[in-house]
Regions:
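N-terminal substrate-binding region of glycoside hydrolase catalytic domains
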Residues: 1-3, 25, 29-40, 169-175, ...
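Active-site cleft segment of glycoside hydrolase catalytic domains centered on the general acid/base Glu
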Residues: 1-100, 107, 113-122
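Solvent-exposed, polar/charged alpha-helical surfaces in well-ordered, non-transmembrane soluble domains
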Residues: 9-13, 50-54, 58, 258, ...
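Extended hydrophobic secondary-structure segments that form protein cores and membrane-embedded regions
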Residues: 25, 67-69, 210-214, 281-292
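Short, internal active-site loops enriched in acidic
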Residues: 29-32, 71-76, 215-218, 288-297, ...
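Glycoside hydrolase catalytic-domain groove-lining segments
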Residues: 43-47, 51-67, 93, 98, ...
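Aromatic-rich peripheral "rim/lid" segments of glycoside hydrolase catalytic domains that contact
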Residues: 222-325
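C-terminal extracytoplasmic interaction modules
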Residues: 312-435
Length: 435
């Protein structure tokens, strides 16, 4: 046996020889294997993983948490889409196995559906930008994979969204890969031929925590549209996210991680199990992807040593990026250092990542903020006693008609003023901050 089983047991023995580990995965992202059927409802690889979990337990003992890291499209069931109507919770025998301590999910679920311009569906709903935290969080338990899906590439291009429904059964969560709460808290019933079985599967509702064994987003434009893809010219699986313009964007990666961790950290979004007394999603064990053991900056700089170094620029790597600070946090810090009360500063309208900022001489906080405003393109406005920082280039937030205006006591209702042509700009000059 020189296959997967031997390799996993070899790693388990290495962990044992090293003194043990806190957690161990018997496999990761094997939907092509776990969905193979030897009969209408028999999944031999799932049983093989159960046997493997028992063998790993015999090596590592009860002090190690053992799990399987399922792909986000795999964990919740097998719906082959072959016209049979079959819908099986095929991994439930594994999730329910006493040797499995948690439900592992490699979470790369999309959190946005952003396009060019302001006419696409999400912008038309009033969301200001793809970086907006409330927008991203609205798609953690909503949007694509929860409320609707795209039936084809043509539908995606035209934003023709098909609602996720379940007919007379009224259990749409069965088909929602984002509906973790319903999947975790309900009994599961297989549906051979589309007909619900009379008895539930082995899964006990709320019986085990969910760990996001991977959680990440590439540092590429509109990465949250399709966080699971990566750009690698040498790979046959190289893709850019849907509607990405292909440039580097550290800010969207940071926005994704902040939105996700903060959302699951809220008690209202993460219920407590009545069986084991802890949260559904065990946030402390959610592992952001990816940290590289190779030392930064030698990786990615030494491409003659590591040939994948060029992929770092647009990839999921966090090494070399999390030392940056969000634009909002930096502006807020400068305001507080200037003595402004915290409740008088609103930076929720800012997005961007600042890799470094050097103040070379004595200057006021306002001067420092002005430099940032020129670079990132934002304005400061005072409303209702609060200084609000707002990015430029957003869609219109209000529309005024003549009926909204008050006529002056004297003169015309509307007055047009023409500027002196010699005072208007004669040329446009710009410089590239980062290409």
């Amino acid at each position: 046996d020189w296959g997967l089983r031997r390799m996993v047991l070899h790693y388990a023995q290495l962990c044992d020889a090293a003194g043990g580990v806190d957690a161990f995965l018997i496999g990761t992202e094997m939907p092509g294997l776990t969905t193979i059927r030897s009969g209408a409802s028999t999944y031999p690889a799932v049983q093989a993983y159960r046997d493997l979990a028992a063998d790993v337990r015999s090596i590592l003992g009860s002090g190690t948490k053992i799990g399987y890291a399922a792909d986000w499209s795999e964990y919740f069931g097998h719906q082959p889409g072959d016209g049979s109507g079959d819908a099986f919770f095929h991994l439930d025998p594994l999730w329910a196995d006493p040797e499995i301590d948690f439900v592992g999910i490699d979470n790369y679920m999309p959190l946005s559906d952003w396009r060019d311009g302001f006419e696409h569906a999400d912008a038309a709903e009033g969301w200001p930008a793809i970086y907006d935290r409330a927008y991203l969080q609205s798609n953690i338990a909503g949007g694509e994979g929860f409320d609707w899906f795209y039936a084809s590439a043509t539908d995606r291009a035209a934003q023709v969204r098909t609602p996720i429904a379940d007919g007379t059964a009224s259990e749409p969560w069965v088909f929602r890969y984002k509906d973790l709460r319903a999947w975790w808290s309900n009994a599961h019933y297989d549906r051979p031929g589309g007909v619900e079985s009379g008895a539930p599967t082995a899964w006990t509702p709320q019986s085990k925590p969910i760990w996001f064994t991977e959680l990440g987003c590439p540092a590429i434009d509109r990465g949250t549209n399709q966080p699971n893809v990566f750009f690698d010219p040498k790979s046959s699986e190289s893709f850019t996210p849907y509607f990405s313009r292909g440039w580097r964007d550290d800010a969207i990666q940071r926005a994704y991680l902040e939105a996700t961790y903060l959302w699951w950290g809220e008690a209202a979004n993460n219920p407590v199990s009545s069986l084991y007394g802890d949260r559904m999603v065990h946030v402390p064990e959610c592992a952001a992807w990816t940290w590289d053991a190779r030392p930064y900056p030698f990786f990615p700089a030494l491409t003659e040593v590591w040939t994948d170094g060029a992929n770092w620029r647009l990839g999921h790597w966090l090494t070399g990026r999390l030392g940056a600070v969000s634009l909002a946090a930096l502006v807020r810090h400068l305001c507080l250092r200037a003595g402004l009360p915290e409740d008088r500063v609103d930076v929720t309208g800012l997005w961007g990542a600042v890799e470094g900022y050097v103040i070379t001489s004595l200057e006021s906080p306002r001067a420092s903020i002005t430099t940032l405003a020129r670079h990132f393109g934002f304005d400061a406005v005072e409303t209702e006693g609060v200084i609000r920082f707002i990015m430029r280039g957003r869609a219109a937030v209000a529309t005024l008609s003549p009926n909204d205006m008050v006529a002056p006591r004297e003169g015309d209702v509307l007055e047009l003023t023409r500027g002196q042509e010699t005072e208007l700009p004669q040329a446009l000059k710009w410089q590239v901050a980062r290409a």
